[in-house]
A protein has these predicted regions:
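Non-catalytic terminal extensions that flank enzyme cores
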Residues: 1-60, 83, 340, 353, ...
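Feature 926 captures the class I aminoacyl-tRNA synthetase adenylation module centered on the KMSKS loop
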Residues: 2, 205, 403-485, 489, ...
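Glycine- and acidic
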Residues: 4-12, 50-58, 113-117, 142-149, ...
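Active-site-adjacent "gating/activation" loops or surface patches in catalytic cores
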Residues: 257-265, 476-508, 513, 698-705
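Phosphate/diphosphate-binding loops
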Residues: 324-349
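N-terminal catalytic cores of NTP/NDP-binding nucleotidyl/phosphoryl-transfer enzymes
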Residues: 38-99, 150, 159, 218-221, ...
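Short, solvent-exposed turn/loop segments enriched in Gly/Ser/Thr/Pro and often Arg
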Residues: 41-42, 50-51, 84-97, 147-155, ...
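NTP-handling and nucleic-acid-processing catalytic cores
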Residues: 14-26, 72, 137, 141-142, ...
Length: 825
């Protein structure tokens, strides 16, 4: 016994940052710990880390999720696996284009394309660096030296190769189809990128007239689309309108270049209770219109162009924006005495997820990934994957139930991966690049090694090098991929697809896909679709789907609500003695939240303990500090207390003279460690964290340690061995959650870092556990009762107390309990 080896008297954020900086500053040691070594001979476990999108401040809910993904990676290392935990950044897409447009005050199409791409790349690199710093601050143990960027030539080359492979298989097609289109941003979007926002609208009852003079009221919120009406329908069972079926009805507005009347027929999709029960079907008001046009074989009209303006078919409204045309049509109908009623109402309006602009359905020639034909096979493959929690698998299945059309993957934007296609001068042949080569067809010709394919049959006709002179002036495709077309290749990319066949054979299906529930229908679904189409394989062994980070009242955080909390301010809270203060808007008033110290270790512990995977979690810095910083303090105090006692020379060999109370605590400890090991194996962070927290701060610190302090001070070997063995193993088991805390304490105490442990600590006991573990609750109840009695009598805990009898079931611990509480007869 001597002065504590752990000289720092308390855990602090400054100490945490010092350890972190040492941890990340030595790249050689860092890589020895965390770099992926596929030749180690260990079981390979690949984490398909969600490549975050750098668009300003990293959302605190996402930072919390990534800290738990790191816990998964570290726990699998602790279980002896060779973990590849890549760091990737998703840098393609419309978000950075929006940012550049906002910064410059100019729309994308006013730039030269190359100039705009350079601006996007420079801007996103600034955000990427800030994100790297936050990733390190929250303690991620990624293989940063193997960072991948989805806008790099390497990644884009793989994306383009996958496109070519799917095209050759017939799983990618080019077609003129109705597409969801954002006219403000000038691009097609997929179903999964559509949100519905509550907005005010007008339900207008309009009087139409049949050719034989019968008035019919039709209700609509889109009168500007009357010019694109292809048919009027009623429900086949609606007796009110049986006499109208087969009649021709005249459009109540002027049009250009089309018939002035359409037929009235029946269709089961009509909701008789909506408005008058008579529906105009236009090209295209919604997906039901699309389905009816397709089913009845109607020729669609293009009422809205790519700029969001009305076309010639709209007659006097040509060139107007949609909203303006809507009001003008209402005015003209009113002047013609054809407005029966106008009802102001709120309506769920479909808008683009990123731009929040009302979307239209427009006929466009786009590229599509076929998906409806493979849904049954995908469901079979999904059954081969383990979901955490199992209930969140339903998010995926529910989304798949709604899939009825192919996935449009081409966009009319710029900062994305280009569609890797050139067209021959006659348009009958296409040229595709060699595998892995990134190309930009809008500004360069096909590279050497490209192949020429028949556009319709996809037959390979030969090499570009041999046939180029026969193809005339080739034209490069100007469209690009949807962002998810790139992002959904992440598991293939990190597992070595195309680049390392040997690794891919060992690493795929990928070990785990960790992500939030909000991108199940996009990132998860599209990734699984690719794996099914390309490889007929499940994409992953495990899928971990977490909930969302919410404000203290359970609301989504957003700029409009003013309830966001900056992640870095929480991680830095307490550094340099600076406290944290957050002013956020609550449901009723603005609230000031305050905390003295949090840091990354407390933040990680909070996320691990406070909510089970899949549950939404409320983020309140005050609660994080109050509930969890004290846990670190208590465990730190246990370790520091231990550090004043000599570490036994052999912590692997069980002493022969264990005291009864040591046998009891070791029995309880073994059960806890078995529970934790099982939890890490099952990727159950919550159970592992709660088990370690409860044991460390409960039965160990508050009960056993108080029971044996006098023995420790007397130099008792059994007590010292038991204490050090538990502290050492606890730090190993705890290291996935709080790595820097565990590293510092274990390195100081045992001259080995807990984060370097590559096997879960186990202890072999040569006595029966059951008899001991059965009395644990009784021990805790007895101790609490004695403490309560002393408090009621105004006695300090070190004061003798009489007339307390140790219960019969605790007689094996009578001596240490008597000594602990100073019981007298």
């Amino acid at each position: 016994m001597g002065a504590p080896l752990i000289e720092d008297k308390r855990w602090s954020i400054d100490l945490e940052k010092r350890i972190q900086e040492e941890h990340y500053s030595d790249s050689e040691i860092y890589n020895q710990r965390y770099a992926f070594n596929p030749k180690s001979g260990k079981e390979i476990f690949v984490v398909d880390t969600p490549p975050p999108y750098p668009s300003g401040t990293w959302h605190i809910g996402a930072v919390a999720q990534y800290s738990m993904i790191d816990v998964i990676a570290r726990s699998q290392r602790l279980l002896g696996k060779e973990v590849y935990f890549p760091w990737g950044v998703d840098r393609n897409g419309i978000n950075i284009e929006f940012t550049v447009e906002k910064n410059t005050g100019r729309k994308m199409k006013t730039f030269e394309r190359a100039e705009f791409l350079d601006l996007c790349r420079d801007t996103i690199e600034e955000y990427t660096q800030a994100m790297r710093e936050t990733a390190a601050r929250v303690g991620l143990s990624c293989d940063f030296d193997k960072e991948y960027l989805t806008d790099s030539d390497e990644y884009r080359g793989v994306s383009q190769s996958i496109f070519v492979d799917l095209f050759k298989r017939g799983d990618i097609v080019e077609d003129l189809r109705p597409n969801i289109y954002d006219p403000v941003e000038g691009t097609t979007i997929a179903d999964a990128e559509v949100e519905r926002l509550r907005r005010k609208s007008k339900l207008i009852d309009i009087r139409w007239t049949t050719e034989d003079g019968v008035d019919v009221v039709i209700s609509t919120t889109r009168p500007e689309l009357i010019c694109a009406c292809g048919v009027v329908v009623v429900h086949p069972d609606d007796d009110r309108y049986q006499h109208l079926i087969g009649k021709k009805i005249v459009l109540p507005v002027e049009t250009e270049g089309r018939s002035k009347s359409v037929e009235i027929t029946t269709h089961p999709s009509v909701k008789s209770e909506f408005g008058s029960g008579v529906l105009m079907v236009c090209s295209f008001g919604d997906q039901n219109d699309v389905a009816v046009f397709r089913e009845l074989g109607l020729m669609p009209f293009q009422a809205i162009d790519l700029e969001g303006n009305m076309t010639e078919v709209s007659g006097p409204y040509v060139g107007m924006k949609v909203a303006e045309a809507r009001e003008r049509v209402i005015d003209d109908l009113s002047s013609a005495n054809r407005i029966v009623n106008i009802i102001e109402k709120e309506q769920d309006v479909p808008v683009s997820e990123r731009g929040k602009n009302p979307v239209e359905i427009i006929l466009l020639k786009e590229w599509y990934v076929r998906q409806t034909h493979i849904q049954d096979r995908m469901r079979e493959l999904i059954e081969d994957m383990e979901f955490h929690p199992i209930r969140n698998k339903q998010f995926l299945l529910d989304w798949m139930d709604n899939i009825s059309i192919d996935w449009p993957i081409s966009r009319r934007r710029w900062y994305h991966t280009e569609v890797p296609i050139w067209y021959s001068e006659d348009g009958e042949k296409i040229i595709t690049p060699p595998a892995g080569v990134y190309v930009q067809p809008w500004r360069e010709g096909p590279p050497t090694g490209s192949r020429v394919l028949d556009r319709e049959s996809r037959e390979d006709l030969g090499s570009w090098d041999d046939l180029s002179s026969q193809l005339g002036q080739v034209i490069g495709e100007e469209k690009v991929f949807d962002t998810w077309m790139d992002s959904s290749n992440s598991n293939l990319y990190v597992s070595g697809y195309l680049s390392d066949p040997e690794l891919f054979s060992k690493a795929f299906p990928t070990g785990i896909r960790p992500q939030g529930k909000e991108i199940v229908r996009t990132w998860l679904y599209y990734t699984l679709l690719k794996s099914a189409l390309l490889l007929d394989s499940p994409g992953f062994k495990h899928v971990w789907i977490d909930g969302l980070g919410m404000d203290p009242w359970g609301r989504k955080m957003s700029k409009s609500l003013g309830n966001g909390i900056d992640a870095n301010s929480v991680l830095e809270c307490g550094a340099g003695g600076r406290t944290g203060s957050w002013k956020i808007r609550g449901p009723d008033k603005v609230v000031n939240l305050r905390a003295n110290k949090i840091g990354s270790e407390c933040f990680r512990l909070w996320k691990a303990c406070d909510a089970q995977v899949g549950d939404d979690f409320q983020i309140n810095p005050e609660d994080i500090e109050q509930k969890y910083f004290g846990v670190l303090t208590k465990l730190f105090n246990v370790a520091r207390f231990s550090s004043q006692f000599d570490v036994p020379s052999d912590l692997e060999k069980l002493p022969t003279n264990l005291a009864p109370e040591d046998e009891w605590i070791l029995s309880e400890f073994q059960l806890v460690m078995q529970r934790v090991e099982k939890a890490w194996q099952e990727i159950d962070i919550y159970t592992a964290a709660q088990s370690l927290k409860n044991f460390s701060t409960g039965v160990l610190a508050s009960h056993w340690l108080e029971m044996v302090k006098s023995r420790l001070y007397d130099g008792d070997n059994s007590a010292a061995w038991t204490l050090h063995r538990m502290v050492r193993d606890l730090l190993d088991a705890f290291s996935p959650i709080c790595p820097f805390f565990s590293h510092y304490l274990s390195s100081t105490l045992y001259e080995r870092s807990a984060v370097d442990a590559d096997s879960f600590p186990t202890i072999s006991l040569n006595f029966e556990l059951d008899g001991w573990t059965e009395i644990t609750e009784s021990v805790m109840i007895f101790n609490s009762e004695v403490w309560r009695m002393k408090k009621e009598q105004g006695l300090s805990l070190n004061t003798e107390i009489s007339d307390i009898i140790v219960p019969d079931n605790l007689l094996a611990l009578k001596v240490p309990l008597t000594r602990m509480h100073k019981l007298t007869d």
